[in-house]
């Protein structure tokens, strides 16, 4: 049986580019959420349902669709799911009311599976000692897509309107859908592919949650981290574009652009986790995150000072994700996609909670309530990271 070939360096980075483009779609809404709310005549709490339902649909899509990656070609599945994303974007672009816009966003979320197929695909095609580094490259692509989406959406919406943002996104998705067949390997069936039928794959998730309980802890940690990430950027957009601060959506985009420089440090944190072990590294990263996020409230009314906690959060947030993924991507190859399914479902459930909480807290308590809630979630993440280290140590070894 033909073995999957090792990824070249160029392929690793092209996969990261693909991950960036397909991930970005869900995050264009963040800097323009105020503009969209005003266009449709709704308040902050109601518009918060758009990203919340997107995140819930993403969790459902991952639960139902991602396990197929353990049985069928990742290449074929990725292309099919990107076509589905194109459909959701077109609905959002043409929507004349909030209901149809929300339907398109929800459809988009359901098919946003490619960023989570790609790490499992890559993990079977890299040497074990490079797993942390390559996982970090793909994670950097995801985070870069999220951050650049905010920059582009904020600036484009300020000068050309929010619909133009989604027309551009549709064009990018069509381009990446056409490019994927040349990036991903064709015609090799993985020797470790599961022989379980589809319903068996879904049912096996319960057995994995029972037998591989650490993935639940890693998923909870990332769910908290991702939820606070979403709450921060939604609350920040409402705060900066509201009457108290009075900035345009382009300023939110520029701030996201500044934060995007942090993505270049992510591969370094992955290599560090390769050396000292992912669980120990995660404890350290979570402590740094608490220190950074504690500055949100005192610096909240000064745009320049706000850059400090935002930069710190954007440096260590992806690093925590990388270390959490490393705790299960080192497991048996035939289990990795399903373990990823459990992890990502928990992550996006956290994102849905963060979407609702970020907008509702801002409407009820302003920036103070939002900043304090995010700090509390950071503290809980830090505690769970320490618990995970105490329970599991770093049993899968540093490799260097």
Residue ranges and their predicted role:
Residues 104-141:
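Cytoplasmic helix-loop-helix junction between adjacent transmembrane helices
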Residues 137-182:
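Helix-loop-helix hairpin linking two adjacent transmembrane segments in secondary transporters
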Residues 2-6, 185-219:
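Juxtamembrane intracellular "pre-TM" segments in multi-pass secondary transporters
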Residues 279-324:
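C-terminal transmembrane helical hairpin of 12-TM major facilitator-type secondary transporters
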Residues 60-98:
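Conserved MFS/SLC helix-loop-helix module at the cytosolic interface between two early adjacent transmembrane helices
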Residues 114-126, 319-332:
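Intracellular juxtamembrane helix-capping segments at the cytosolic ends
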Residues 62-73, 264-278, 362:
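Helix-to-loop junctions at the C-terminal end of transmembrane segments
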Residues 77-90, 280-295, 375:
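Structural signature of the two symmetry-related core transmembrane helices
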């Amino acid at each position: 049986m033909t073995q999957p070939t090792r990824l070249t360096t160029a392929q690793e980075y092209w996969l990261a580019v693909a991950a960036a483009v397909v991930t970005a779609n869900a995050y264009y809404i963040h800097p323009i959420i105020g503009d969209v709310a005003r266009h449709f005549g709704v308040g902050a709490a109601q518009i918060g349902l758009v990203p919340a339902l997107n995140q819930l649909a993403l969790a459902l899509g991952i639960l139902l669709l991602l396990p197929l990656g353990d049985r069928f070609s990742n290449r074929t599945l990725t292309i099919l799911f990107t076509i589905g994303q194109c459909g959701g974007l077109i609905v959002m672009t043409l929507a004349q009311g909030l209901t149809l816009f929300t339907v398109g966003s929800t459809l988009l979320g359901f098919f946003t599976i490619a960023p989570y197929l790609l790490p499992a695909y890559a993990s079977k095609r890299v040497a074990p000692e490079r797993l942390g580094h390559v996982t970090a490259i793909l994670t950097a692509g995801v985070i870069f897509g999220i951050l650049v989406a905010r920059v582009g959406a904020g600036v484009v919406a300020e000068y050309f309107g929010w619909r133009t943002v989604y027309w551009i996104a549709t064009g990018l998705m069509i381009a990446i859908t056409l490019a994927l067949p040349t990036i991903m390997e064709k015609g090799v069936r993985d020797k470790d592919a599961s022989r379980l039928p589809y319903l068996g794959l879904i049912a096996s998730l319960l057995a994995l949650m029972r037998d591989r309980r650490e993935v639940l802890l890693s998923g909870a940690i990332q769910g908290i981290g991702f939820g606070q990430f979403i709450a921060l950027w939604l609350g920040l957009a409402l705060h900066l574009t509201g009457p108290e601060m009075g900035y345009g959506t382009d300023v939110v985009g520029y701030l996201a652009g500044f934060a995007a420089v942090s993505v270049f440090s992510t591969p370094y944190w992955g290599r560090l986790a390769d050396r000292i072990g992912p669980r120990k590294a995660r404890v350290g990263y979570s402590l740094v995150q608490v220190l950074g996020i504690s500055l949100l409230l005192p610096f909240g009314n000064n745009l320049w000072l706000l850059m400090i906690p935002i930069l710190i959060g954007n440096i260590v947030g992806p690093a925590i994700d990388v270390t959490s993924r490393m705790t299960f991507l080192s497991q048996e190859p035939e289990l990795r996609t399903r373990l990823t399914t459990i992890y990502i479902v928990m992550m996006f459930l956290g994102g849905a909670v963060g979407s609702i909480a970020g907008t509702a807290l801002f409407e009820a308590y302003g920036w103070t309530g939002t900043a304090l809630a995010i700090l509390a979630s950071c503290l809980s993440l830090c505690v769970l990271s320490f618990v995970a280290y105490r329970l599991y140590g770093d049993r899968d070894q540093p490799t260097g």
